[in-house]
């Protein structure tokens, strides 16, 4: 085991809900530690989400100790040794130490154990195989601490065998590298992912979607996605052409504008050129209706936006709304190869912040006075007037609006002359 180190930057170990759970589970011959992502992120000074706990205690003992301490327990996966304890409305998954007796794909015949090293060896990557006890001492049975220091994502054990256990680990390898790694992906892991690419086809769309969405917004997404493309690993996921250049362009544009990473927007840059691509991705990744609509809108004639003048941009913004306008324009920017500091693109994309979209000022009453009654005719005249108002660049003066209304009625009457 690698020499342990003390984790000082983890106040949640000293007080709060996690510390309480550890205190309840420790003692009388049993030990509990925080494991996995929380330890990794604490060591990397990254935000910590869920805190998972492993223990030598069997599930029944976990439940009985929780009950005695007044802590709610939920047997969420008790057949696998997992009990969820809820403290101050925060859930903690507590899992009894396990070791594989026999593995076959994602399935494994496991036995509860008391060996921390055997439990750590079941995890996927070395940086996820660390544990920390209540005193803040980090225990490393798999070589994770040197990999944390090097920001290196490495499989525990033989990469090919670990991938064959669950082919989702191919996507996890790149996603974890994009989130926490540095430089090129670990060579042995990378080659094993390429060799095992055929296994991606058997994964459920829901599981693939989860990893793809997390990958899209990771800090190192550009490098990871490029490595996947070079290894032939994007085609089995997206099923069609992909565009790493525009993907990099979208990331650069988001950063230049100070925007939060958006998974769907980045996915559009990577894999959507026309609206049919959005429909294909929706099926392959089980996208929500809202996500599909966003992708579909991005792919709709985005190429018409690149050379707009300011007046045309205002009309597009009026028709599309701020979100669809920005998304579609950013796709055009990313696909144009334009520099992220290009003033013209920046001006177009930031138009919604600089210009308030006005409401169309003409109403039904304005046309009733001109002999147009409620009904289909009114709708057609209003549409003609709105088009003319946009073409005139949104005038607000009374005389201009009167002229637009008169012209719309005259055109309608001319077009519908018996």
How would you label these PLM feature ranges?
Residues 1-418:
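Catalytic cores of the polymerase beta-like nucleotidyltransferase superfamily
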């Amino acid at each position: 085991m690698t020499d342990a180190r003390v984790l000082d930057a983890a106040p949640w170990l000293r007080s709060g809900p996690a510390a309480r759970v550890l205190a309840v589970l420790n003692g009388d011959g049993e030990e509990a530690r925080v494991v996995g992502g929380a330890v990794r992120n604490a060591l990397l000074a990254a935000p910590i989400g869920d805190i998972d706990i492993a223990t030598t205690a069997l599930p029944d003992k976990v439940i009985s100790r929780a009950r005695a301490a007044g802590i709610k327990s939920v047997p969420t996966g008790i057949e696998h040794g997992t009990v969820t304890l809820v403290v101050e409305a925060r859930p903690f998954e507590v899992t009894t130490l396990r070791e594989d007796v026999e593995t076959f794909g994602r399935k494994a015949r496991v036995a509860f154990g008391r060996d921390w090293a055997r439990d750590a060896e079941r995890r996927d990557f070395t940086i996820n195989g660390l544990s920390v006890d209540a005193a803040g001492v980090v225990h490393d049975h798999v070589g994770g601490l040197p990999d944390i220091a090097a920001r290196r994502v490495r499989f525990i054990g033989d990469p090919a065998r670990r991938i064959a256990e669950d082919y989702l680990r191919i996507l996890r390898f790149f996603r974890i590298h994009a989130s926490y790694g540095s430089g090129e992906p670990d060579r042995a892991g990378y080659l094993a992912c390429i060799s095992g690419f055929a296994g991606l086809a058997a994964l459920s769309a829901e599981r693939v979607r989860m990893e793809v969405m997390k990958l899209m917004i990771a800090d190192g997404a550009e490098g990871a996605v490029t490595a996947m493309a070079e290894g032939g690993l994007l085609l089995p996921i997206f099923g069609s052409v992909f565009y790493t250049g525009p993907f990099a362009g979208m990331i650069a544009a988001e950063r230049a504008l100070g925007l939060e990473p958006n998974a769907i927007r980045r996915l559009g840059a990577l894999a959507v050129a026309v609206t049919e691509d959005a429909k294909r991705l929706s099926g392959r990744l089980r996208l929500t209706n809202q996500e599909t609509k966003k992708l579909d809108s991005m792919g709709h004639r985005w190429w018409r936006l690149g050379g707009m003048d300011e007046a045309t941009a205002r009309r597009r913004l009026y028709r599309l709304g701020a979100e669809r306008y920005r998304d579609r324009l950013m796709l055009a920017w990313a696909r144009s190869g334009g520099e992220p500091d290009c003033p013209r693109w920046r001006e177009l994309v930031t138009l919604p912040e600089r210009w308030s979209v006005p409401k169309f000022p003409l109403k039904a009453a304005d046309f009733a006075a001109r002999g147009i009654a409620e009904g289909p005719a009114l709708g057609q005249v209003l549409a003609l007037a709105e088009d003319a108002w946009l073409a005139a660049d949104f005038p607000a003066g009374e005389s201009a609006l009167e002229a637009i209304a008169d012209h719309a009625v005259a055109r309608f009457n001319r077009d519908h002359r018996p």
